[in-house]
């Protein structure tokens, strides 16, 4: 905002899909599949989906060794949980199944917070839980299994993609997120201490 002192931002946070025009929103940030095929969309980035749980939960329930072991665990379903239909790939091996959630939270931050509190295992975009992984509040599970990616897109309200302020905001976000996004690495997994940078 220091570069654009006249810029005004009205930030609305939530995982609900509002009508952008009715809400007076120029641009929205959306994770995952988009339902409005008429919207103007610009991809910002894609994060891998990861499974994570707290050490307290894992001390109590044990760690899953394969995706099918998840059936024996408390699952927290959040917005990145794909309605509980999870798919994993490891080399030539693929598995897909429906999981039952013990807890469903429709806000990403709430689902991550529930996992930090030891309520179960959550599937979430890596970028959404990176801090918790780095601080050791969460441990990444089954890192050798690919659970797909979640895209972050900028969705412009009808007729507002041409607004210079909306374009400048999205350009800034893309530059800032790609500048601060570390290269893909392996956050702490079972048996590892979290690696922190100074």
Regions found by a protein language model. Name each.
Residues 1-40, 186-198:
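Central regulatory/effector-binding core of bacterial HTH transcription factors
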Residues 1, 85-98:
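Ligand-binding cleft/hinge of the Venus flytrap
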């Amino acid at each position: 905002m220091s570069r654009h002192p006249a810029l005004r931002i009205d930030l609305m946070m939530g995982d609900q899909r509002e009508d952008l025009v009715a809400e007076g929103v120029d641009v929205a940030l959306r994770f995952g599949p988009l339902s409005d095929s008429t919207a103007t969309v610009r991809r910002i980035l894609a994060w891998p989906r990861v499974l994570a749980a707290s050490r307290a939960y894992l001390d109590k329930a044990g760690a899953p060794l394969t995706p099918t072991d998840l059936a024996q665990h408390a699952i927290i379903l959040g917005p990145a949980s794909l309605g509980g239909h999870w798919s994993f790939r490891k080399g030539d091996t693929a598995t897909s199944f429906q999981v039952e959630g013990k807890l469903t939270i429709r806000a990403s931050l709430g689902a991550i917070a529930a996992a930090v509190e030891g309520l179960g295992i959550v599937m979430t975009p890596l970028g959404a839980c990176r801090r918790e992984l780095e601080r050791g509040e969460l441990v990444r599970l089954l890192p050798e299994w690919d659970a797909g990616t979640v895209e972050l897109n900028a969705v412009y309200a009808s007729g507002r993609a041409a607004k210079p302020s909306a374009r400048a905001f999205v350009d800034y976000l893309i530059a800032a997120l790609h500048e601060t996004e570390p290269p893909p690495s392996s956050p702490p997994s079972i048996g590892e201490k979290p690696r922190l940078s100074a």
